[in-house]
C-alpha cells in the first residue's frame, strides 16, 4: 500500500525567519520539486499571509499551533478559522516543543486537533518519545498513549498526517536509523489497524521527523511505512529541495 499514499514533506520553520529570509526560501522553493510529493511549510503565525501570498499555490502553508475554540478571551492564541482566513489550510499540532517547552498535555492536543478538523483545516498531529523513554523500552507505550488520546477527536482521517518525531533526534544531529524509524512506523500502522480500522491504517500517511537531512532522507524514504518527513532546520535551507525529492 505504501505506493498508494502520496509522499508528504512538511517544513517546520519554528520561530525563525523574517520577510527577507522568507523571500530567499520562496526563491529556492521554486524547485524543481517532485510532482509526486505533497509539500507544506509551517511558518510563524505573523507571516502566514505573507508566505501564502508569495509561495506557489502547489505548496501548502501551515500554522504551527492553534487553540481549541473559535474565538474568545485567549490572549496570544489563534483559531483555526483565523488560519483559514489567512488563506492557509494546514496546522501542526502537538509538536514536541509544544508538549515539552509549553507543557501541553495529550488531552489539550487532542481537543485542538478535533476543533481544527471541525473548522475544516488539515492537521499534522505530532507524537514521539524522549530519550529516556526509548532507553527504558517505553517507545510503544508512549506513542500508543499519544495516539489513543488523539483518536476520539479525529473526525476525518483523510485530512490527517501523523508525524512521528522521536524527541531525542530533534535538532540533536542524532537520527533514528531507517530500521528504527520503520519499526515504529509499522507498529503505529498496526495500532491504527487494531484500534481504528484497516482502511485508515492503509491510507493514513505517517511521516518521520528528527534531524532529516539530504544525506539520510533517501534511505529513510525507501522504507515501507515512512510516507515522508517533517523537517525542521533543514527546511530553511536550499537543501530542503533534495529532501522533497527524496524518492526521485
Curated annotation (Swiss-Prot):
Substrate binds at residues 12, 14. PROSITE patterns: TIM_1, TIM_2. Keywords: Allergen, Cytoplasm, Gluconeogenesis, Glycolysis, IgE-binding protein, Isomerase, Lyase. Unstable only at extreme acidic (pH 1.0) or alkaline conditions (pH 11.0). IgE-binding activity is relatively stable under acidic and alkaline conditions, however the activity is increased between pH 2.0-3.0. The active site is at residues 95, 165. GO terms for cellular component: cytoplasm; cytosol. Homodimer. Belongs to the triosephosphate isomerase family. This is Triosephosphate isomerase.
Amino acid at each position: 500500500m505504501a505506493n498508494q499514499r502520496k509522499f508528504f514533506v512538511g517544513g517546520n520553520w519554528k520561530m525563525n525567519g523574517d520577510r527577507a529570509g522568507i523571500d530567499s526560501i520562496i526563491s529556492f522553493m521554486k524547485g524543481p520539486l517532485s510532482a509526486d510529493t505533497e509539500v507544506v511549510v509551517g511558518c510563524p503565525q505573523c507571516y502566514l499571509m505573507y508566505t501564502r501570498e508569495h509561495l506557489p499555490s502547489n505548496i501548502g502553508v501551515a500554522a504551527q499551533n492553534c487553540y481549541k475554540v473559535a474565538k474568545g478571551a485567549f490572549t496570544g492564541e489563534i483559531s483555526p478559522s483565523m488560519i483559514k482566513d489567512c488563506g492557509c489550510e494546514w496546522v501542526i499540532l502537538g509538536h514536541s516543543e509544544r508538549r515539552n517547552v509549553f507543557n501541553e498535555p495529550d488531552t489539550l492536543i487532542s481537543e485542538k486537533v478535533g476543533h481544527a478538523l471541525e473548522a475544516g483545516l488539515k492537521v499534522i498531529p505530532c507524537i514521539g518519545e524522549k530519550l529516556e523513554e526509548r532507553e527504558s523500552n517505553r517507545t510503544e507505550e508512549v506513542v500508543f498513549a499519544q495516539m489513543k488520546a488523539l483518536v476520539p477527536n479525529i473526525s476525518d482521517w483523510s485530512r490527517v498526517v501523523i508525524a512521528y518525531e522521536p524527541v531525542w533526534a530533534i535538532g540533536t544531529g542524532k537520527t533514528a536509523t531507517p530500521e528504527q524509524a520503520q519499526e515504529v512506523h509499522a507498529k503505529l500502522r498496526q495500532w491504527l489497524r487494531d484500534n481504528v480500522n484497516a482502511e485508515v491504517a492503509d491510507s493514513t500517511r505517517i511521516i518521520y521527523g528528527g534531524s532529516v537531512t539530504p544525506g539520510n532522507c533517501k534511505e529513510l524514504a525507501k522504507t515501507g511505512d515512512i510516507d515522508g518527513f517533517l523537517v525542521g532546520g533543514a527546511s530553511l535551507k536550499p537543501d530542503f529541495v533534495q529532501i522533497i525529492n527524496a524518492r526521485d
